[in-house]
Amino acid sequence: MPRKGPAPKRPLVQDPVYGSPLVTQLINKVLVDGKKSTAERIVYGALEGARAKSGGDPVAALKKAMDNVKPSLEVRSRRVGGATYQVPVEVKPGRSTALALRWLVGYSKARREKTMTERLQNEILDASNGLGAAVKRREDTHKMAESNKAFAHYRW
C-alpha cells in the first residue's frame, strides 16, 4: 500500500472526431503495442461502418451497446474457514465500464469477420441490439451472482 495514498485520477481527453471520452477509452482498449493511430483507424472505421449500417448516431449506438454489456453484479472469491465461496458484490461504475469495454473488444477479436474494424463494428451493433457474445457474458455474470445469492452475507 503506498504511503502517499492512491494516485489521482487523470482526466480523460475527449477524442477529436466525436468529442466523447467513451470513444477515447475504446481506442485505448483496442490499442496494441503502442500503435495508437492503428487503434484510432480501427475504432473510427467501426463507428463509421455502424453509422452506415444502422443509419443513426454511432456514439449513441456505442452507448446503448455499453448499457447492454455493463454488469451490475459480479462474484468475488472469499475464503472462509477452508472453503472458498463465490460472493456476489455490486460493481462500481468505473469497473463496470472497464469490464464492458474489455468484453466488447475481447469478443470482437474472437469473431470470424476478416478485419478487426468489421468485427468491432458488428459486435457493437449486436450489443446495441441485445445480442452478441459480450451481452451473453454479462448475462452469465449476473446468473452466477444470482445463483450464489445465499453467500451474499459474506460480502465485505
From Swiss-Prot:
BP term (GO), one: translation
InterPro entries in UniProt: Ribosomal_uS7 (IPR000235), Ribosomal_uS7_bac/org-type (IPR005717), Ribosomal_uS7_CS (IPR020606), Ribosomal_uS7_dom (IPR023798), Ribosomal_uS7_dom_sf (IPR036823)
Keyword Ribonucleoprotein listed: yes
Cleavable signal peptide: none
Superkingdom: Bacteria
Keyword terms: Ribonucleoprotein, Ribosomal protein, RNA-binding, rRNA-binding, tRNA-binding
Keyword tRNA-binding: yes
Listed GO CC annotations: small ribosomal subunit
Single GO MF descriptor: tRNA binding
Similarity comment: family membership: Belongs to the universal ribosomal protein uS7 family.
Main function: One of the primary rRNA binding proteins, it binds directly to 16S rRNA where it nucleates assembly of the head domain of the 30S subunit. Is located at the subunit interface close to the decoding center, probably blocks exit of the E-site tRNA.
Cited PANTHER family: RIBOSOMAL PROTEIN S7
Subunit text: Part of the 30S ribosomal subunit. Contacts proteins S9 and S11.
Annotated protein name in UniProt: Small ribosomal subunit protein uS7
Species: Pseudarthrobacter chlorophenolicus (strain ATCC 700700 / DSM 12829 / CIP 107037 / JCM 12360 / KCTC 9906 / NCIMB 13794 / A6) (Arthrobacter chlorophenolicus)
